[in-house]
Amino acid sequence: MLSLEGVTKTYRVGAFGTSTLTAVDDVSLDLAPGEVVSLIGESGSGKTTLGKMVLGLLPPTRGRITLDGERARPGKAYYRHVQGVFQDPFSCYNPVFKADRVLTMIRGEYFPGVADSEWQGRIETSLKDVGLDPGQILGRYPHQLSGGQLQRLLIARALLLDLRYLVADEITSMLDASTRIDVLNLLADLKARGLGVLFVTHDLSLGNYISERAVVLYRGQVVESGSTSAVFGNPLHPYTTRLLSSVPRLTARWGGGEDDGPGEVPGPDGHEGSSTLVEAEPGHLVRRAVTGTTSLRSAS
């Protein structure tokens, strides 16, 4: 189990660092093997910051991230099981390295004792597992591959490890529609094999398509979480309702005069003061105002 417990990230801002900015505020969630959890929010909601903390690219200011009950510590032992794929696949490659070298570097770092012939077989298997033809990929530079091929190559590289959890941060936003569906279906196949996926997205339709659970972030806080069917089918927080109202429907036409949904959302809980997540329905949590301060805990 990959778990986040009260994870918070604050930054010092201002000319002399006298002010603080809270990018992620007391977030808790669990990701199980074979589960896809969508982390949903607009730009600036804190979802990418949260993903970077899971990957050890940023340290939490407070809280804990654990893997099977042990505190996550960035390093070989952790990255052998937890990897990430990002929005712009080109930024993840050295432009002078061919695909062969990208994959072979994994052996030098993690499996130095594996023979050349065995490693080549592993490479070909991992490429085929993500729908890539080794003959068309190996020997090519990143600029010679499409965005979809580069995303698949990143996933194939991760599969060469003992991968258990994948952070997928906006990985389809730069892909065309057909390639996007191919990558999503690939994640679904990997999920069926036991891979846990934290799917970071601002696109509600993709979150609805791929995940069993949805966690909605607003200004760094979880405002609603639960099964995807509950959160999307019966949204209980005004921010979630506003997000859903912005998704085009097949029965609606642009400029048709339909209801635009709720207006501005005043704050994470819609009220002044402190707030907490309460269980409105079994497994369906929503942020509400309270009189006292209670720690936030999302659904397991």
Regions found by a protein language model. Name each.
Residues 15-18, 70-83, 97, 101, ...:
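ABC ATPase NBD coupling module
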Residues 55:
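Helix-to-loop junction immediately C-terminal to a conserved catalytic motif
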Residues 141-145, 149:
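Conserved ABC ATPase signature
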Residues 160-164:
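A short, proline-enriched helix->beta-strand linker immediately N-terminal to the Walker B motif
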Residues 207-209:
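A short, surface-exposed alpha-helical micro-motif characterized by mixed small hydrophobic
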Residues 227-299:
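Charged, flexible cofactor/metal-binding loops and thiol motifs
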